Amino acid sequence: MAETKVILTKSVNHLGHPGDVVAVKSGYARNYLFPQGLAFAWSKGAAAQIEAMKRARLAKAVATREEAVAAKEIIEGSTVEIAAKVSESGKLFGGISAEKIAIALSSKVEVNPKNITVEPIKTTGDFPATVALHPEITANFFVKVVAE
């Protein structure tokens, strides 16, 4: 069976990332990659366009890394205070989620709640937390839970 060179437009498991030129079976390209919008046929003109996209992506990665370093300087070692309803014994009604922590952090820096790592919080007190700002950069901070 003949192979066809394609340029990926999105990440495909076991194949590559956007902008990669890969050789795949013709049927796989025609029946899956092209209809799903995951790739388009390789050509010299398209290859030049992809190189420009890769350079732009690299420049963007450098910019986001610089933003992550700036955000780390703001977040590192700081304390975020969250007020929650508490029972008489000091336990929370519910818990403190990563979403609530992200909302509290938004006064300093916007972060994705999925990037926040914290142990389950069920009582008042200070708790360590970590946020991944970039694949190479993380910031440690504290979450202070107080009674409402």
Curated annotation (Swiss-Prot):
Keywords: Ribonucleoprotein, Ribosomal protein, RNA-binding, rRNA-binding
Protein name: Large ribosomal subunit protein bL9
Organism classification: Bacteria, Bacillati, Actinomycetota, Actinomycetes, Bifidobacteriales
Homology family: Belongs to the bacterial ribosomal protein bL9 family.
Pfam families: Ribosomal_L9_C, Ribosomal_L9_N
UniProt keyword annotation of Oxidoreductase present: no
Organism of derivation: Bifidobacterium adolescentis (strain ATCC 15703 / DSM 20083 / NCTC 11814 / E194a)
GO biological process: translation
Classification via NCBIfam families: L9 (TIGR00158)
